[in-house]
Amino acid sequence: MDTSSINAQSIFDDNAATLKLSWLTGHEGWERGFSADTVANATSSADLVGHLNLIHPNRIQVLGEAEIDYYQRQTDEDRSRHMAELIALEPPFLVVAGGAAAPPELVLRCTRSSTPLFTTPMSAAAVIDSLRLYMSRILAPRATLHGVFLDILGMGVLLTGDSGLGKSELGLELISRGHGLVADDAVDFVRLGPDFVEGRCPPLLQNLLEVRGLGLLDIKTIFGETAVRRKMKLKLIVQLVRRPDGEFQRLPLESQTVDVLGLPISKVTIQVAAGRNLAVLVEAAVRNTILQLRGIDTLRDFMDRQRLAMQDPESQFPGKLV
């Protein structure tokens, strides 16, 4: 991942209002940030932001009341040694939190070394939590997929398939049935947690749906505010295909999944053919997926019922399948 754009200046600009940050000194070091190795070796955003810790120098160092009190109790010699060691390790920047006054020696050393030094009246714990959430979001794995991303019955569903199969027309039909549009054509996905992938629309395409013959439709203007969504968690991928009957599996015995940013996402395949009501089929697929998430597998229940029927000597289906 390119980390060159993640530096003290960008982090300050994005969080100054939320965290009430003030840039005290070290403005010349605005380009300081994280190396690619530091980001690659970090197991989570907790490795990139934390309380003052000289063992982990390559992270954002936050000094709260406890750290400042500890500093004040040290001898002049120990203070000088600790400050020199901290600055020599070249952290991206330092934050003095809790409204505490930054120690004069720390301010002087940050000025001389061009180390950015921020202050904030907010507590150290609040600053760390907020910066960790921010770092986890901007450093999360990302991907852009082609398709129509919708909110169907509260579930994020991505319609995919070759061009010309009618994905946008199907999306328009589903929107007219009360479902919501997240994005059309290009969908930005980001893995924000260990068990979910979130999809959003690029700002340029916000609220727009392209339909052949009609051009660009502003879904928010046509259908109202409730017809669009800002983001949704991806739970199901519906792939539209056009195949001969002999190549289409009517009853897949195993659940199908697609890997999206390292997370398996449920997938169903729907054949496009004349006379098929695709909107109803997609809604049924979503309802069935919801049941599966609740532990209800209709196909497996049927197979168990069939097996018991064949084992029953009084059953009207004696014998076994061949």
Swiss-Prot record:
Residue numbers spanned by region Important for the catalytic mechanism of both phosphorylation and dephosphorylation: 209-218
Catalysed reactions, semicolon-separated: [HPr protein]-L-serine + ATP = [HPr protein]-O-phospho-L-serine + ADP + H(+); [HPr protein]-O-phospho-L-serine + phosphate + H(+) = [HPr protein]-L-serine + diphosphate
Keyword Electron transport: no
Pfam families per the UniProt record, alphabetical: Hpr_kinase_C, Hpr_kinase_N
Domain of life: Bacteria
A GO term, aspect molecular function: ATP binding
Residue ranges, annotated region (Important for the catalytic mechanism of dephosphorylation): 271-276
Positions bound to ATP: G161, D162, S163, G164, L165, G166, K167, S168
Active site: residue positions: H146, K167, D185 (proton acceptor), R250
Necessary cofactors: Mg(2+)
GO biological process: regulation of carbohydrate metabolic process
Binding site for Mg(2+): S168, E210
Keywords assigned by UniProt, alphabetized: ATP-binding, Kinase, Magnesium, Metal-binding, Multifunctional enzyme, Nucleotide-binding, Serine/threonine-protein kinase, Transferase
EC number: 2.7.11.-, 2.7.4.-
Assembly description: Homohexamer.
Domain notes for this protein: The Walker A ATP-binding motif also binds Pi and PPi.
HAMAP family: HPr_kinase (MF_01249)
Family: Belongs to the HPrK/P family.
Miscellaneous note of the record: Both phosphorylation and phosphorolysis are carried out by the same active site and suggest a common mechanism for both reactions.
Function, in words: Catalyzes the ATP- as well as the pyrophosphate-dependent phosphorylation of a specific serine residue in HPr, a phosphocarrier protein of the phosphoenolpyruvate-dependent sugar phosphotransferase system (PTS). HprK/P also catalyzes the pyrophosphate-producing, inorganic phosphate-dependent dephosphorylation (phosphorolysis) of seryl-phosphorylated HPr (P-Ser-HPr).
Name of the protein described by the UniProt record: HPr kinase/phosphorylase
Organism encoding this protein: Burkholderia multivorans (strain ATCC 17616 / 249)
The gene coding this protein: hprK
